[in-house]
Amino acid sequence: TTTASISQKFCTQPPLADVPEVLLWRQYSSALSITHDVPMRTKVGCNDGFTRAFTQSFLMANGKPIYAAGSGYQGDNTLDAVKSNRDERLQLFVWGESNKVDTDPAAGKPRKLYAAPGDTLSYITTSVVETRCITGYQPRKYYTYDYAQSMNDELRGTNACPIFRTAEAMLNYMEACYELTGALDATAQGYWKALRKRAGVDTNYQTTIDATDLSQEGDWSVYSGTTPVSTTLYNIRRERMNELFSEGLRYQDLIRWRSFDKMLTTKWIPEGANFWDEMYKSYLDKKGNAPKADGTADAVVSSKDLSK
């Protein structure tokens, strides 16, 4: 099963009864007035967004972290560059410049979130709180190209919501096995290879472990309390994060790992996309002025003197 089929099967269809991976799911129905707003909320911003540390956690297709020698990382001047040759879950579930927003004929002309200068639909620079993406890394998981579900904010979503699937069970086993024994048995190894294969990542997880430098990993799951974990355990946690993000489990994981404790001793400043090297050019107004970034209450992006 490919990552693309993950999206098609359990992220973008109303019934999930015929999807073996999904063990428990919630059904929605416009006829029963049980609907949601996820399609529209992933189409526009939702006053949220993934952090730079999160996107950096995804491996390259060759299994190496982005900072490792020979990784092939293309940098972060554009969102498409960030996603290039990476774990296919990052490619699929985070919006980039080349992703079309509307392809359903009912929507009219196909559009993109990040397009040519003056022709962008991105919600990075809007001052409207409920439709802005505050980091530039806009979530795309559960988006559907069925325009009837995303034409407005009137709770038109009817696609099903997976609650528990076999991938989570596999990750649970991997983590428990390593925490209990300090090693991975044949079953855990097989699960890990299967998850990586489906994500388009080299199945040799030892390549990743050997190339991991915890001092260059910006994610909280590096820590249990304020103590760094082993590179093996961190990579098991990385796999869990990269597989299950946007599925409502992240906060619980960080709590049970006591990863938030690190903030008791170290300041944490969330970072977003690299805006000021290249991306800003798509947000100039007709006079060539960049978005307001002077630190005042109505500024819409951070100053280029403080960040990229």
Predicted region positions:
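Acidic/polar-rich alpha-helix caps and helix-coil junctions
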Residues: 1-42, 68-308
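Active-site-adjacent helix-turn-beta-strand microarchitecture at beta-sheet edges
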Residues: 60
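Active-site core of glycosidic bond-cleaving carbohydrate-active enzymes
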Residues: 25, 47, 51-53
